[in-house]
Amino acid sequence: MATAEKPVLTRYKDRMDKAVLSLKEDFAGLRTGRASSGLLDQIMVNAYGSMVQLNTVASISVPEPRQINVNIWDKGVVSAVEKAIRNSDLGLNPVVEGNNLRIPIPPLTEERRKDLVKIAGKYAEAQKVAVRNIRRDANDDLKKAEKASVISEDELKKMETEVQKITDGAIKQVDEALKTKEQEIMQV
């Protein structure tokens, strides 16, 4: 039975790791006082008759701490890219310079910083719920295996303890990521 328990638990650990990774991707899209190419990752552009991610029609660079440059490959989608960035809830105003957009990053107000911290907290809580749901799935599967006599009651308890350790580790990673992001947002 020892060989059968590892794949089961690693499958759930992988799912929890993906939840933590998803949180970090969500955090990359939250604006802080500094410029970051990840800030524009979630922006969708209406180009060529469909919605595509910004990075499929342009390259994004950060030449200065408070500026993002977007080099658009096709002049025909410059206005669509500008409109998508302007209409995003990031509060950015791009300046068109030929095929390039220069996006100055204004400093955040104290009120906006607090709003962003709340949003980050909501993202983190959503991922904690996802991790707990994965734990529930794992425990349900373990109980089914015990009921079907695939594992013994002792193995069930041992594996449930292991699932809880994995869950605690994932929750700790979420909390650490949130703390780091909050500090980054509140940094003036």
From Swiss-Prot:
Coarse class of the protein's main subcellular location: cytoplasm
InterPro entries in UniProt: Ribosome_recyc_fac, Ribosome_recyc_fac_dom, RRF_sf
Localisation: Cytoplasm
An annotated GO cellular component: cytosol
A GO molecular-function descriptor: ribosomal large subunit binding
Keyword vocabulary terms for this entry: Cytoplasm, Protein biosynthesis
Pfam families, per database record: RRF (PF01765)
NCBIfam families: frr
Protein family membership: Belongs to the RRF family.
Known function: Responsible for the release of ribosomes from messenger RNA at the termination of protein biosynthesis. May increase the efficiency of translation by recycling ribosomes from one round of translation to another.
Name of the featured protein: Ribosome-recycling factor
Native source species: Caulobacter sp. (strain K31)
Gene field: frr
